[in-house]
């Protein structure tokens, strides 16, 4: 997992009225929390810096951030995961951000997005792809957490499926999502019969 550095400022004023003032100054209020912290750290993030993280995929994939937090004349450094971003659905404006501070020596439980790759044989035959589980809960050291998990669907035919238990992940990653959860399956189209599919496959192989 790559590490990206971002600068923050510690804030003392908390509440909706102050949050609005901060946002008008292009500063997004946020909080840093974690099991090893004595107390939550309330912070401010430059709006442009937060948008840059989103554009780089940090809101959809897992990456370690190195938070450089200015606290007057002091500087606090924490490693963290971008846990949540609140965005106004109407104005598409940033409202708040949560950072989950982590120790690089302690395992964390995080959700990692699933990315389907390839084009299924079953879809080419007219089957319909159904995407089930879109995130997998795993336990690993922060630097061992992958940004996403790729699932190759190329060989899936109509009626086939891939479950969480079918994933082949490194030994240093423990999967916490139930093994029988379906990630993807190819369902038959309306009026589908195995005989028709077999005849179609034979025709394609002869052409």
Curated annotation (Swiss-Prot):
Gene Ontology terms: cellular component: cytosolic large ribosomal subunit
Record function comment: This is one of the proteins that binds to the 5S RNA in the ribosome where it forms part of the central protuberance.
Gene: rplY
Family: Belongs to the bacterial ribosomal protein bL25 family. CTC subfamily.
UniProt key word Chaperone: no
Keywords associated with the record: Ribonucleoprotein, Ribosomal protein, RNA-binding, rRNA-binding
Alphabetized Gene3D superfamilies for the sequence: Ribosomal protein L25, beta domain, Ribosomal Protein L25, Chain P
Highest taxon of source: Bacteria
Coiled coil (residue ranges): none
Assembly and oligomerization: Part of the 50S ribosomal subunit; part of the 5S rRNA/L5/L18/L25 subcomplex. Contacts the 5S rRNA. Binds to the 5S rRNA independently of L5 and L18.
Source species taxonomy: Bacteria, Pseudomonadati, Dictyoglomota, Dictyoglomia, Dictyoglomales
GO MF, any single term: structural constituent of ribosome
One GO-annotated biological process of the protein: translation
Protein name: Large ribosomal subunit protein bL25
């Amino acid at each position: 997992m790559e590490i990206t550095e971002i600068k923050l400022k510690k804030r003392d004023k908390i509440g909706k009225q102050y949050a609005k003032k901060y946002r008008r100054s292009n500063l997004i209020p946020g909080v840093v929390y974690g099991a090893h912290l004595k107390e939550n750290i309330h912070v401010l993030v430059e709006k442009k810096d937060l948008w840059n993280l989103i554009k780089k995929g940090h809101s959809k994939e897992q990456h370690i951030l190195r938070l450089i937090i200015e606290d007057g004349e002091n500087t606090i450094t924490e490693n963290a995961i971008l846990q949540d971003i609140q965005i106004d659905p109407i104005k598409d404006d940033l409202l708040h951000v949560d950072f989950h501070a982590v120790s690089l020596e302690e395992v964390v439980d995080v959700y990692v997005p699933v990315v389907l790759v390839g084009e299924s044989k079953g879809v080419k035959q007219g089957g319909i792809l159904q995407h089930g589980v879109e995130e997998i809960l795993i336990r690993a050291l922060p630097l061992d957490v992958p940004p996403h998990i790729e699932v190759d669907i190329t060989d899936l035919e109509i009626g086939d499926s891939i479950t969480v238990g079918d994933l082949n992940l490194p030994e240093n990653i423990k999967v916490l999502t139930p093994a029988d959860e379906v990630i993807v399956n190819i369902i038959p189209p309306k009026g589908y019969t195995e005989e028709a599919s077999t005849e179609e496959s034979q025709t394609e192989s002869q052409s």
